């Protein structure tokens, strides 16, 4: 197993790729909330933990938190993000 970090910015449709969005606009969701992302990860059956009081490195003034997810070694991080986005739409 390996861990991946999911910042809300990674799937936010309001962000550009330069601002940290990792998925394409077609998959991205508008203003994703940490709790909503956690709910989707839980429904996917993955282990996770939430870190609420952390700020995204490119925006240290904004406390948004992140989710640490345990995934299989051969799992694609981008595919996990896309699955989360699909279930949020």
Swiss-Prot record:
Annotated family: Belongs to the SRP19 family.
GO BP term, pick one: SRP-dependent cotranslational protein targeting to membrane, signal sequence recognition
Species this protein is from: Methanococcus maripaludis (strain C6 / ATCC BAA-1332)
Highest taxon above the source species: Archaea
Known role: Involved in targeting and insertion of nascent membrane proteins into the cytoplasmic membrane. Binds directly to 7S RNA and mediates binding of the 54 kDa subunit of the SRP.
One GO cellular component, as annotated: signal recognition particle
InterPro entries: Signal_recog_particle_SRP19, SRP19-like_sf, SRP19_arc-type
Protein name: Signal recognition particle 19 kDa protein
GO molecular function: 7S RNA binding
Keyword annotations: Cytoplasm, Ribonucleoprotein, RNA-binding, Signal recognition particle
Gene designation per UniProt: srp19
Location of this chain's protein in the cell: Cytoplasm
Keyword Acyltransferase (UniProt): no
Subunit details: Part of the signal recognition particle protein translocation system, which is composed of SRP and FtsY. Archaeal SRP consists of a 7S RNA molecule of 300 nucleotides and two protein subunits: SRP54 and SRP19.
């Amino acid at each position: 197993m390996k861990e991946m970090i999911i910042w809300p910015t990674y799937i936010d449709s309001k962000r550009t790729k330069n601002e940290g969005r990792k998925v394409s606009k077609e998959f991205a969701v508008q203003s994703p909330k940490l709790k909503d992302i956690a709910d989707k990860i839980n429904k996917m059956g993955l282990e996770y933990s939430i870190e609420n009081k952390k700020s995204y490195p490119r925006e240290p003034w904004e406390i948004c938190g992140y989710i640490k997810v345990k995934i299989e070694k051969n799992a694609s991080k981008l595919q996990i993000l896309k699955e989360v986005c699909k279930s949020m739409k």
